[in-house]
Design a protein with these regions (language model features):
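Membrane-interface helix-loop junctions in multi-pass transporters/channels
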Residues: 1-131
Length: 131
């Protein structure tokens, strides 16, 4: 990986994280029961990553080098900082486009359940250390 790509990911990721923070702060007073800001980040991020994937595939606006830079800055960087859920959603889309419906369903189930179990496990491991 080149230094330029690393910098692009870092710059994009920083701006994505700031955007996520701003959105969660802006929506914090709207709902106390659900994390509306994160929900919106996941939905908006998924919409944008789908649009960017199609745009970079279908248009010839950028040459291959520029397209790579745009992808690392905006998709890997910005959307990675804004939400990692968007990458998960793009992976599901790719599986569905290849006709791998059952693999996509399994991937969704395993990802969500394993992540939930990991969060619970991590939480209780640390809570056990501090008790």
């Amino acid at each position: 990986m080149g230094l330029l790509l690393l910098l692009l990911v870092g710059i994009g990721g920083g701006f994505g994280a700031m955007a996520r923070f701003a959105l969660t702060q802006a929506t914090a007073s709207i709902s106390k029961q659900i994390p509306l800001g994160i929900l919106l980040c996941n939905i908006i991020g998924s919409l944008i990553i789908g649009m960017m994937a199609a745009f970079l595939i279908e248009t010839k606006l950028f040459n291959e080098d520029v397209s790579t830079y745009v992808r690392f800055l905006l998709v890997t960087g910005f959307l990675g900082g804004f939400t990692t859920f968007s990458s998960f959603s793009l992976d599901i889309l790719n599986l569905l486009q290849r006709g791998e419906i059952f693999i996509a369903i399994g991937y969704i189930m395993v990802s969500v359940l394993a992540s939930l179990i990991a969060v619970i496990l991590g939480f209780y491991i640390v809570m056990g250390v501090y008790k």
